[in-house]
From Swiss-Prot:
Organism, as annotated: Cyanothece sp. (strain PCC 7425 / ATCC 29141)
PROSITE patterns xrefs: RIBOSOMAL_L21 (PS01169)
GO molecular function: rRNA binding; structural constituent of ribosome
Protein name in UniProt: Large ribosomal subunit protein bL21
Protein function: This protein binds to 23S rRNA in the presence of protein L20.
Family of the protein in this entry: Belongs to the bacterial ribosomal protein bL21 family.
Domain of life where this protein originates: Bacteria
Summary of subunit composition and partner proteins: Part of the 50S ribosomal subunit. Contacts protein L20.
Name of the gene this protein is made from: rplU
UniProt-listed HAMAP family: Ribosomal_bL21
Region called Disordered, residue ranges: 110-130
């Protein structure tokens, strides 16, 4: 299983190819590709590359799916014995990213879909030989 730990907007996320994640709002239009360069760790199934603090030459390629707003969080402030109450709501602006690939030193790390595709190609070659 291939995964990476990336830092974006002051938070760290464990990301895998083919999955989507909600991060703080990015100034990128939907359907555009972004490259996340702050990669802290890369695991490609066999080896683990740990950065000091970042992994050299590692990037994560993602596509912006959409911009959305998170669930409403209610903030309630009250001063006892003063009849002072303040109720406020907040919805965080988010961007949904689909992780396309994890690149390490210019080469794409294996994704979960690639081994299955390789096996399907090998099965087709065996069938065509028979």
């Amino acid at each position: 299983m291939t995964y990476a730990i990336v830092a974006t907007a002051g938070k760290q996320f464990r990301v895998e190819p083919g999955r989507f994640y909600d991060v703080d709002r990015m100034n990128v239009e939907p359907e555009q590709t972004v490259s996340l360069d702050q990669v802290l760790l890369v695991h490609d199934g066999d080896t683990i590359a740990v950065g000091q603090p970042l992994v050299e030459g590692a990037t994560v390629e993602a596509t912006v799916m959409q911009h959305l707003r998170g669930r409403k969080v209610i903030v309630y402030k009250m001063r006892p014995k003063k009849k002072t109450r303040k109720k406020q709501g907040h919805r965080q602006e988010l961007t949904r990213l689909m992780i396309n690939a994890i690149h390490l030193n210019g080469s794409s790390a294996k994704t979960a879909a690639q081994p299955a595709a390789d096996e399907a190609v090998a099965a087709n070659e065996v069938d065509s030989e028979a």
